[in-house]
Swiss-Prot record:
Gene Ontology cellular component annotations, sorted alphabetically: nucleus
Protein keywords: Activator, DNA-binding, Homeobox, Nucleus, Transcription, Transcription regulation
Residue ranges: DNA binding: 150-209
The protein, known as: Homeobox protein CDX-1
SUPFAM superfamilies documented for this protein: Homeodomain-like
Localization terms from the record: Nucleus
GO biological process: animal organ morphogenesis; anterior/posterior axis specification; cell differentiation; digestive tract development; embryonic pattern specification; positive regulation of transcription by RNA polymerase II; regulation of transcription by RNA polymerase II
SMART domains per record: HOX (SM00389)
Primary gene name: cdx1
Record's compositionally biased regions (Low complexity): 214-233, 241-254
């Protein structure tokens, strides 16, 4: 009526159409159009928020206002909000990475593939050679003429080396430094090996001499006679004295018999 007349008369005052062209509504169901803000293009007015509380809800013919699909904006704040609040940073869902569980892929694949899992039996294995030794010492001969016995090397001398060393030992039981160097160079040994051989040879000679002396003392103790005891000589002396005293006695047959006893 009068309100509709004013609305149709002055279109410059209300540039936007108030009524939908396909609906014939009464003036009582009139609801003002949502205002538009040029500074905030992404802002949309929600009907019923700033309306008069005494007016109530609009009629059932009006539905709640929803923006069209073309007016939807992507995820994140608009340009106006970002300029107003510079502390907010827009990000897309593709930049978000969920927290990875520990042990899944924290290490590079090259490191994970190069380290094989160790079994409990492999972890308990003894990695050292000296821990795997048995109670029986093993003897191995190397190419340099040394024999490994338990904890030390024992030099294996040839027959020619032993012969030359024995000759030198019979000549002198204590070898000089000059002769030791000459003998080591001639036999292909070191001076330390020659010195150790002479030390062992002297120890062996002392052991042999000690054994010979013990055998000689045992033989001498078995061949010597035992000296006579003192009691035996005293008995022999008593027998001699008794025999000499008996020789001084006169036998009864030698005495003269008187005639009176005969008659």
């Amino acid at each position: 009526m009068y309100v509709g007349y004013l609305l149709d008369k002055d279109n410059n005052m209300y540039p936007n159409p108030v009524r939908h062209p396909g609906l014939n509504l009464n003036p009582q169901n009139y609801v003002p159009a949502p205002p538009q803000y040029s500074d905030f293009p992404s802002y949309h007015h929600v009907p019923g928020i700033n309306s008069d509380p005494h007016h109530g809800q609009p009629g059932g013919t009006w539905s709640s206002y929803t923006p069209s699909r073309e007016d939807w904006h992507p995820y994140g704040p608009g340009p106006g909000a970002s300029s107003a609040n510079p502390t907010q940073i827009a990000f897309s869902p593709s930049d978000y990475n969920p927290v990875q569980p520990p042990g899944s892929g924290l290490l590079p694949p090259s490191i994970n593939s190069s380290v094989p899992p160790l079994s409990p039996s492999a972890q308990r294995a003894d990695p050292y050679e000296w821990m795997r030794r048995t109670g029986v010492p093993t003897t191995t001969t190397t190419t340099n003429g040394k024999t490994r016995t338990k904890d030390k090397y024992r030099v294996v001398y040839t027959d020619h080396q032993r012969l030359e060393l024995e000759k030198e030992f019979h000549y002198s039981r204590y070898i000089t430094i000059r002769r030791k160097a000459e003998l080591a160079a001639a036999l292909g040994l070191t001076e330390r090996q020659v010195k150790i051989w002479f030390q062992n040879r002297r120890a062996k000679e002392r052991k042999v001499n000690k054994k010979k002396m013990q055998q000689q003392s045992q033989q001498a103790s078995t061949t010597t006679p035992t000296p006579p005891s003192v009691g035996t000589t005293a008995g022999m002396g008593g027998l001699c004295s008794s025999s000499s005293s008996n020789s001084n006695l006169v036998s009864p047959s030698s005495m003269p018999i008187k005639e009176e006893y005969l008659s």
